[in-house]
């Protein structure tokens, strides 16, 4: 009986501690993987227009803009072009920015999207985060009808937690010969 009382007391203490921590946050509402370092949700939403212009200033920016344009064209069927000085979506790469090499700042307003990064890697990760803000159908290789192409207005700042990326291969579950 004494052990049961101790067990019940422990369970109640755990339940009380769980209630002390908030279960939702701004980052949880956005659903980006990996979770960004800093996320501020703003009011409103960015509606992807029928004619999208993705602007850039560097060669890395051009490659990222082309990749993004190809994905958006395929899934939305919209007229997506790259180039120009001002676009609905702007990719700005500047080595003078004070952020980590692979860091970025993504600003989504009702008027447009701005991705700022120090390097092309950071801009690419910013573009990937923006794509995750759109409906999941954006990953479709064919045009998807009946989807409202909108993204929540927000301001996201992110950078990798570590300066390296890793890969783990479990040899127990992947049968590789000794040779």
Predicted regions and their residues:
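Bacterial N-terminal signal peptides that target proteins for export
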Residues: 1-11
